[in-house]
Amino acid sequence: MPKYRSATTTHGRNMAGARALWRATGMTDDDFGKPIIAVVNSFTQFVPGHVHLRDLGKLVAEQIEASGGVAKEFNTIAVDDGIAMGHGGMLYSLPSRELIADSVEYMVNAHCADAMVCISNCDKITPGMLMASLRLNIPVIFVSGGPMEAGKTKLSDKIIKLDLIDAMIQGANPNVSDADSAQIERSACPTCGSCSGMFTANSMNCLTEALGLSQPGNGSLLATHADRKDLFLNAGKRIVALTKRYYEQDDESALPRSIANKAAFENAMTLDIAMGGSTNTVLHLLAAAQEGEIDFTMEDIDRLSRKVPHLCKVAPSTQKYHMEDVHRAGGVLAILGELDRAGLMNRDVDNILGLKLTETLNQYDIMLTQDEAVKKMFRAGPAGIRTTQAFSQDCRWDTLDDDRAEGCIRSLENAFSLEGGLAVLYGNMALDGSIVKTAGVDKDNLTFRGPAKVYESQDTAVEAILGGKVVAGDVVVIRYEGPKGGPGMQEMLYPTTYLKSMGLGKACALITDGRFSGGTSGLSIGHVSPEAGSGGLIALIEDGDMIDIDIPKRSMVLDVSDSELAARREVELARGDRAWTPKNRERQVSFALRAYATLATSADKGAVRDKSKLGG
């Protein structure tokens, strides 16, 4: 029978000092035999996805204590990728994931907490907490802050739906008036919550459902809706029961590595492909799998991408649907239900509810359930009122979207495409793979051949695009933006956005060893591995080299002879200590970022730290 971790600090005469300090936090004699559960919050006023979380930890804590546990809350950092975008701040985004994972480990292990409730929401916070959960392997429940409502405004006598990406595109479009641009900006992000499309934050919060670590509705129920409060209240109750299952009943099925096993990771990736999730999810799932010592690799992702259909198309791949529409159509479990009926789900997986997948679908898939309370929850909709307050409205759709032929979520027979929304491309440019969000690629662009225009930073690429130096047919190559070469693997949202602003969204391709925002669409290929900073072939491309992209064949090839590439490699190696670094780039890189770069692996490994360099 496992012993409560917290007993290390709460039992025995030698721990009198620790108990004295616990008493100073409000604990009493009666508390010293109870499980101590960490409420891992991420409130900050910097991030709209987290601005409403201040009091939500207290909600969870009250339920923990009412259910027989002791709750202790702490906060992690949280970076807003949208605000950090387009300047040096983006260098810090991906490295913040490792800091979040480490900070959770530090707090939980230093204080011997028995379990966790992770209150996350945005891009690197959910992945960081997920990595920590699988590293620590103690009972955990995830409950996120929820999606933002979609923006709406009236332009040219027509009501249109908006999100952050629209504000960025139209802000750089020379054909859009200042007045219209300002109106779009003011309407794009109307409420608290993670940005309203299937961007990285919402993708990851959906994936925690598929992994079995969060409750039904976690990925899609709006941040502003009163129903979301129940997720927080129930998380507090359920974590105590989950904790006691492990420590008092010796039930290892309550642990995250038992729940989020390889079969669950395959289910999560299958969901991601089917819903056209952010390419960043590939990085984060690979990283989390390594923390949990789960054998889940790029090869698994490639295998799944070839057989999973695209069943749900959401912004940025279309402006018709946002997360509020996914929820109305039944959310994550509706997509999993369609995938299950297509024979694509691993059914023998558990979740924090203590249910198998089939049991969960019978209760929560709107196409199967007879539970009116479940159907009511999925009718939770937007209010269209600007607010930073959680649970501030209780509006509902009159009906559910159960149209699996032409609705937001499709059946296999009516799939948007029989191949899913993400694909892994290989070739001499990416021996270890690269990622493209096929959900956002126009059908006419699935194959592309063009000359390279090479840039050694995002900044110079943006300058060239806005300056008219990139023309139709070009393949924009942005290198030395990988985990090591950046460092920090910046998102290339501005270059892809500005290609659209300049009318080149379907006329050019973009390839990078950096990554993309979940808001990116178009022929944008990222995560090229090995990266330029690690000696990858992307470092040897020259202006004018022809590049062939063939998504159906999963291929990306630089059309340059092996002998020429060998000669270029010799020239690069002759640079000595400066080899595999950008030639003409001025960038201030702090000591903290240099430390990250020293240990960073390429994207095919999840951009995690290289344990071999630490003797691991």
Curated annotation (Swiss-Prot):
Read off the PROSITE patterns from this record. Answer: ILVD_EDD_1, ILVD_EDD_2
According to the UniProt record, what class of enzyme is this?
lyase
Residues bound to Mg(2+): 81, 123-124, 491
E.C. number(s) listed in UniProt: 4.2.1.9
Keyword terms = 2Fe-2S, Amino-acid biosynthesis, Branched-chain amino acid biosynthesis, Iron, Iron-sulfur, Lyase, Magnesium, Metal-binding
Q: Which organism is it from?
A: Serratia proteamaculans (strain 568)
The protein's name in its UniProt record = Dihydroxy-acid dehydratase
Q: Which GO terms describe its cellular component?
A: cytosol
Under the heading PANTHER family, the entry gives:
D-XYLONATE DEHYDRATASE, D-XYLONATE DEHYDRATASE YAGF-RELATED
